[in-house]
């Protein structure tokens, strides 16, 4: 995101999700205690991409050394062999899983403030649901800001939930420079 390199290494741009959660909680205008950070990500195939799979598992294990971190994975979808070799695997179902959890956990009163760090408009129905239906849960968003240029944020019609802007200086505080790929 904030790399100066034209072709950065695969581990450049990584951040520590717990450090991000702590940063957002510490900057809130309300006193908050960070109870959980949830990460949703695709998981490489152990047979099609053993190095990527091992790196992902190492990263997840590192994140989960703190009991406040929950990682939700779904298998990456790989292109069929007859398709272009340039096609990369894609995440499928991650946004749906995140949306279901965001809404379900609000209804069950499992959080009082949920911060959705995404610009994926597929998540708007979940944000709208929590905003309009939840009695207890408050929804907020987070998004990257590069210099004076915000990268966009999720909004609900004319309502703009509070947005936590994260910039390059913040990224320097939460960056994870670990290379999880084994040589």
Each language-model region and where it sits:
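Domain-level signal for Mg2+-assisted phosphodiester chemistry and nucleotide/NA-binding surfaces
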Residues: 1-89, 145
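Nuclease catalytic cores that cleave nucleic-acid phosphodiester bonds
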Residues: 70-183
């Amino acid at each position: 995101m904030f790399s100066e390199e034209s072709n950065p290494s695969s581990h450049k741009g990584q951040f520590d999700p717990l450090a991000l959660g702590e940063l957002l909680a510490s900057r809130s205008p309300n006193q908050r205690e960070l109870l959980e950070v949830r990460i949703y990500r695709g998981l490489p195939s152990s047979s099609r991409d053993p190095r990527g799979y091992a790196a992902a598992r190492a990263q997840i294990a590192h994140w989960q050394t703190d009991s406040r971190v929950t990682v939700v994975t779904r298998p990456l979808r790989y292109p069929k062999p007859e398709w272009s070799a340039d096609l990369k695997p894609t995440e499928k179902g991650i946004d749906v899983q995140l949306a279901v959890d965001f809404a379900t956990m609000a209804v069950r009163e499992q959080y009082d403030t949920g911060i959705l760090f995404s610009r994926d408009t597929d998540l708007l129905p979940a944000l709208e649901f929590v905003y309009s239906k939840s009695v207890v849960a408050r929804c907020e968003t987070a998004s990257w800001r590069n210099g004076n240029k915000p990268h966009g944020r999720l909004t609900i019609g004319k309502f703009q939930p509070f947005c936590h802007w994260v910039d390059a200086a913040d990224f320097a505080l939460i960056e994870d420079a670990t290379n999880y790929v084994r040589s």
